[in-house]
């Protein structure tokens, strides 16, 4: 293995610790005054976020930009609300040339006695919306 400085085309970044990592494969958005974004996979996992905006723009979304959100995790609880003090955040990137979004983040769930080991969810989505 070469020294890190000798490796070309390698990006490294520190990822926050998470209890669950979801690679979501489907996305839809709805406009009901505010924007609702739903990301899900074929295993019943999903992230649903209602934003305090009418458009999904590139940038970071945290407590101030989210009006409500919940996460459903197969084997980890349905409709798990986010922590009201620190719900976590996610980042949206968009490539206008390809129409592809990259959405990734870490959400912190309210504690749940039925699922005490699932409190932090890291997720990512790459695709069109």
Sequence positions of predicted segments:
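An extracellular/secretory-lumen and virion-surface interaction module
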Residues: 1-129
């Amino acid at each position: 293995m070469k020294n890190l400085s000798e490796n070309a085309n390698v990006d490294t970044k520190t990822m926050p610790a998470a209890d669950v990592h979801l690679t979501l494969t489907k996305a839809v958005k709805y406009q009901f005054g505010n924007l609702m974004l739903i990301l899900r996979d074929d295993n019943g996992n999903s992230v649903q976020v209602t934003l305090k905006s009418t458009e999904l723009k590139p940038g970071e979304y945290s407590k101030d930009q989210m009006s409500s959100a919940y996460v459903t995790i197969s084997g980890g609880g349905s409709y798990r609300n986010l922590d009201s003090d620190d719900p976590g955040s996610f980042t949206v990137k968009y490539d206008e040339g390809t129409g592809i979004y990259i959405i990734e983040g870490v959400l912190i769930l309210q504690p749940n006695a039925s699922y005490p080991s699932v409190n932090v969810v890291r997720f990512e989505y790459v695709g069109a919306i």
